[in-house]
């Protein structure tokens, strides 16, 4: 048993483990990123069907009010201070063919998203087409139950949908903005770590096995 563990490279195991972790967290989004992207405009008018696992990219033409907000704050344990709550993400409503979907927008795009919401309502009241340019690159996922419940409340309270109409929409979907280029890099780095870890493991195993074999031959 000791011989077996001596043949295993700790560095190789660590490298392989890091690589596997990076692959686990990045490969699903990497696969989505390589799918042909559907446009927000086609999704809006129902020209394409949107399902979980789809890749949606481009400019968002219209956007309704947010139905949920994600806030974060930072705690500094060294001086027991806490920063004020800060909005890091908002979840908006967007028409999508015969249904409605959620659109997740991060803090860097919130100002543009709010402008687009105001301009959308202005357009529906007889004003000009929206000019705010909200560009997103998204994966489509099913909402988690907490967001789904808030989304249902929003559709019932502000858009006059019945429970049956919401049920008929099928799974409630969320379009989540993703940094697909960065995610692909993580996948590549993860694969590199796995390969490097395997090389180190094989070399260590081969080297130590030869030493043990030589010792056995000398006995």
Where in the sequence are the language-model features?
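Short, aromatic- and cysteine-enriched interfacial helices/patches
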Residues: 1-5, 124, 171
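Membrane-proximal low-complexity regions enriched in glycine and acidic/polar residues
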Residues: 44-137
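Alpha-helical transmembrane signal-anchor/signal-peptide segments
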Residues: 27-51, 171-175
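Cytoplasmic C-terminal tails of single-pass
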Residues: 209-219
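Extended, charge-rich, solvent-exposed interface segments
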Residues: 109-123, 169-203
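Hydrophobic secretory-pathway targeting helix
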Residues: 1-40, 183-204
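Extended, hydrophilic extramembrane loops/domains of integral membrane proteins
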Residues: 125-176
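Short, low-complexity, polar/charged sequence segments that are solvent-exposed and flexible
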Residues: 77-81, 155-160, 191-195
């Amino acid at each position: 048993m000791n011989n077996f563990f001596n043949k295993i490279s700790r560095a190789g195991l660590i490298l392989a483990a890091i690589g596997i972790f990076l692959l686990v967290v990045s490969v699903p989004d990497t696969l989505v990123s390589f799918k042909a992207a559907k446009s927000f405009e086609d999704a809006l008018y129902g020209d394409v069907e949107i399902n979980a696992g789809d890749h949606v990219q481009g400019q968002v033409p219209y956007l309704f009010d947010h139905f949920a907000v994600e806030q974060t704050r930072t705690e500094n344990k060294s001086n027991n201070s806490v920063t004020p709550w800060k909005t890091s993400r908002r979840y908006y409503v967007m028409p999508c063919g015969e249904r409605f979907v959620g659109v997740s927008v991060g803090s860097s795009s919130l100002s543009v998203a709010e402008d687009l919401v105001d301009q959308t309502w202005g357009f529906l009241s007889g004003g000009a087409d929206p000019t705010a340019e909200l560009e997103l690159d998204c994966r489509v996922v099913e909402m988690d139950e907490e967001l789904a419940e808030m989304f249902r409340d929003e559709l019932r309270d502000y858009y006059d949908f019945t429970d049956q109409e919401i049920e008929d929409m099928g799974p409630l979907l969320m379009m989540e903005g993703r940094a697909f280029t960065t995610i692909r890099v993580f996948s590549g780095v993860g694969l590199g770590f796995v390969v490097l870890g395997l090389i180190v493991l094989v070399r260590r195993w081969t080297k130590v096995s030869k030493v043990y074999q030589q010792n056995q031959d000398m006995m």
